[in-house]
Amino acid sequence: MAEQISHKKSLRVSSLNKDRRLLLREFYNLENEPNKGRQEARIGEKASEAHSGEEQVTDVNIDTEANTEKPVKDDELSATEEDLKEGSEDAEEEIKNLPFKRLVQIHNKLLGKETETNNSIKNTIYENYYDLIKVNDLLKEITNANEDQINKLKQTVESLIKEL
């Protein structure tokens, strides 16, 4: 909760589409990849070789890069999105079959996106609040300028009434 609000635009807001495409690519590779068994075997071998938590995190990142090297066209991405909508039951089964490391990767990516979205919302609120303060100050200046003119008019009217 100790996050700072900045009026600057988030640098990663533009990369949301890239992240979404990356996740779709990874999901697409998991569904249709013929080497799936070999990759899971590599994950198991790397997990047994790793001795510390830092090495395990590094291994997870290496496997993620291996899954995303293959370029995917926009048509394939839209087809994947349709498959996701239609086959929610299939997705649940695939999630149950994923290795723990992969689930942690997906969880971390989702948390990162959530944090990014929250920061974007906070930045927007801050910018709007800042603009509201500026408009409020401007309106105060305008009303104060009018009050001086109104006071002069009152004095003039009072002096005219006294003369009559």
Curated annotation (Swiss-Prot):
Higher taxonomy: Eukaryota, Fungi, Dikarya, Ascomycota, Saccharomycotina
Leader sequence segment: none
Protein name (database record): Vacuolar protein sorting-associated protein 51
Main localisation: Golgi
Pfam families in the cross-refs: VPS51_Exo84_N
Acidic residues bias: start-end ranges: 77-93
Biased composition (Basic and acidic residues): 33-54, 67-76
Subunit structure: Component of the Golgi-associated retrograde protein (GARP) complex, also called VPS fifty three (VFT) complex, composed of VPS51, VPS52, VPS53 and VPS54. Interacts with the t-SNARE TLG1.
Localization (cell): Golgi apparatus, trans-Golgi network membrane; Endosome membrane
Cellular-component GO terms for this entry: cytosol; endosome membrane; GARP complex; Golgi apparatus
Keywords on record: Acetylation, Coiled coil, Endosome, Golgi apparatus, Membrane, Protein transport, Transport
Modified positions (N-acetylalanine) in chain numbering: A2
Ranges for region Disordered: 30-93
Coiled coil: 73-164
Biological process terms in GO annotation: budding cell apical bud growth; intracellular sphingolipid homeostasis; positive regulation of macroautophagy; protein targeting to vacuole; regulation of cell size; retrograde transport, endosome to Golgi; vesicle organization
